[in-house]
């Protein structure tokens, strides 16, 4: 049997399921090789590090980048423990809501908590990422431009109360003809490879 996590308010998942038998049951379900899916908040909750939306809203890229370590970037962890998503920060509605900037900030905040490099995985609304037990993943899309974006972390330490500073942020696009390898973030046959300064 598969389990599908609905969209909605992801802070409720964090508040009501973290550290409970429900969270443990989801982990056991995945460890048993059974499928776990989700959309919107239900996908955002699956990474090792995640935006918990504990600030009561939905963070936008300019505000997230203005203070990546700030309190509004409510990055949570210790929710689900999915091996293929270890070291990954997940985000949704990616291209549609211009969330590249916020995912970069979320990765930076997650790295400040983890003390190690992380990667970001942003998924567009018209796409799904299906991850096999060995971590290989494929993108399925209902729109020709939809897919997933990997943000490579390993950023320099960010300063408290200061805007994001990164001389180079590497991103890689995965589409239906790509193979994504998790948790490494390597993409075979990428749709694009782009670099940004923030």
Predicted regions and their residues:
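Catalytic-core regions built around general acid/base machinery
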Residues: 19-33
């Amino acid at each position: 049997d598969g389990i599908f996590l609905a969209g909605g308010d992801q802070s409720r998942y964090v508040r009501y399921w973290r550290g409970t038998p429900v969270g443990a049951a989801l982990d056991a379900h995945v460890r048993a090789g059974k499928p776990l899916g989700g959309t919107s908040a239900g996908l955002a909750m699956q990474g090792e590090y995640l935006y918990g939306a504990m600030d009561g809203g939905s963070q936008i890229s300019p505000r997230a980048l203005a203070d990546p370590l700030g309190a509004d970037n409510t990055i949570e962890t210790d929710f689900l423990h999915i091996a293929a998503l270890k070291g990954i920060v997940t985000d949704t509605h990616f291209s549609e809501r211009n969330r590249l900037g916020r995912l970069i900030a979320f990765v930076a905040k997650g790295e400040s908590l983890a003390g190690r490099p992380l990667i970001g995985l942003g998924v567009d609304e018209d796409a799904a990422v299906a991850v096999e037990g060995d971590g290989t993943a494929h993108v399925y899309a209902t729109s020709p431009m939809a897919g997933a974006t990997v943000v490579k972390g390993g950023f320099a330490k960010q300063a408290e109360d200061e805007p994001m500073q990164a001389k180079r942020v590497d991103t890689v696009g995965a589409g239906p003809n790509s193979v994504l390898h998790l948790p490494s973030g390597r993409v075979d046959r990428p749709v694009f490879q782009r670099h940004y300064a923030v």
